[in-house]
Curated annotation (Swiss-Prot):
Gene name for this UniProt entry: norW
GO cellular component assignments: cytoplasm
Keyword NAD belongs to the record: yes
Pfam family, one: Pyr_redox_2
UniProt KW Oxidoreductase keyword: yes
Protein name: Nitric oxide reductase FlRd-NAD(+) reductase
Length: 377
């Protein structure tokens, strides 16, 4: 490989891939291009920065220069890739271009901001860069509106509440975590958030935002409104696919790849939040770790398929943490819920009484690994 491997992106997926390649090959040319600084930080920490009193710069674990030195690669930070010429094997930015033998897209996903009037007033916390842009406003805010009651919205609501802020969480659904589990399972966390003082506006819709002299006026359905100091969009992520689309790659929800992480072009691969693996978008740490291990082998000449085991998803709400696994969103499961003071175990079984999913909380989380072994893969 005279031109080596070019990676676009610098998040967890890109870094896992670099580390796995270097475990197997110390000399193959590696080039990493990204729009950000390429400094390393732990993205899940963004759900806890306010209660921890952390500034954006406090999150940095390793500088770009240290990363380049440790893993022998060329870095191009603050660089927007504009085009990929797949036929010529060339990646282009406004001022530069790079030849590649193999190309990897690790472009991540961007926060979805609901298309309502005043949407430009909404903040997002999907990267260190985004937090840096709004950290002063968030630290100073007394009243915070979080739009979206999913995993990230629930984590942020608890964190801001622990920091002493007045928190309102709004969602169209009738319960929090509605896309992950049924209400009878999420109700324990929902009750805890309410106990802590989070004002839940469920089955409610944000209709618009407007700047006022004393804050931001949020207009809701049913002729309601509230005034806050900051509004955060936590309404999910959208895989970054524009670059892949322009390159002529197959796109669905994400950049479509097979079990080998290969796109519709034989020399272009994708992993992480931007990838759709055999129809599944899996924006969680464990599948990304496993993808990085497999893709490193395949880029170096192997032909190893990705095989994903049953995997845990962790909801980092410290006052009532949850682990879940399996097909928790399936509508046809019967849920057997065992609740005690020290925690909950909820088992989702099918018509044949086969365990298909589970959710565990607090001290009962230690039972997760035993349950995980009984889930079908």
């Amino acid at each position: 490989m005279s031109n080596g491997i070019v990676i676009i992106g610098s998040g967890f997926a890109a870094r896992q891939l670099v580390k796995n390649i270097r475990k197997q090959d110390a000399t193959i040319p590696l080039t990493l291009i990204a729009a950000d600084s390429i400094d390393e930080y732990n993205k899940p920490d963004l759900s806890h920065v306010i209660s921890q009193g952390q500034r954006a710069d406090d999150l940095t674990r390793q500088t770009a220069g240290e990363f380049a030195g440790q893993f022998n690669l060329r870095l191009f930070p603050h660089t927007w890739v504009t085009d990929i010429d797949a036929e010529a094997h060339v990646v282009k930015s406004q001022n530069n271009q790079w030849q590649y033998d193999k190309l990897v897209l690790a472009t991540g996903a961007s926060a979805f901001v609901p298309p309502v009037p005043g949407r430009e007033l909404m903040l997002t916390l999907n990267s260190q860069q985004e937090y840096r842009a709004c950290e002063t406003q968030l630290r100073d805010a007394r009243r915070v509106l979080i739009v979206g009651g999913g995993l990230i919205g629930s984590e942020l609501a608890m964190d801001f509440c622990r920091a002493g802020k007045a928190v309102t969480l709004i969602d169209n659904a009738a319960s929090i975590l509605a896309s992950l589990m049924p209400p009878e399972v999420s109700s324990r966390l929902q009750h805890r958030l309410t106990e802590m003082g989070v004002h839940l506006l469920l089955k409610s819709q944000l209709q618009g935002l407007e700047k006022t002299d004393s804050g931001i006026l949020a207009t809701l359905d049913h002729q309601r409104s509230i005034e806050v100091d900051a509004v955060i969009a936590a309404t999910g992520l959208r895989p970054e696919t524009a670059l892949a689309r322009r390159a002529g790659l197959t796109i669905n929800r994400g950049v479509c790849v097979d079990s080998y992480l290969q796109t519709s072009n034989a020399d272009i691969y994708a992993l992480g939040d931007c990838a759709e693996i055999n129809g599944q978008v899996l924006p969680f740490l464990q599948p990304i770790q496993l993808s990085g291990m497999v893709l490193a082998k395949n880029l170096l000449g192997n032909n190893t398929p990705l095989k994903l085991p049953a995997m845990l998803v962790k909801i980092k709400t410290p006052e009532l943490p949850l682990h879940l696994a399996g097909e928790t969103q399936r509508q046809d499961l019967r849920w057997q819920i065992n609740t005690e003071r020290q925690g909950m175990v909820a088992r989702g079984v099918d018509d044949a009484d086969q365990l298909r999913a589970f959710v565990v909380s607090e001290d009962r989380m230690k039972e997760a690994f035993v349950l995980l072994k009984t889930l079908p893969v």
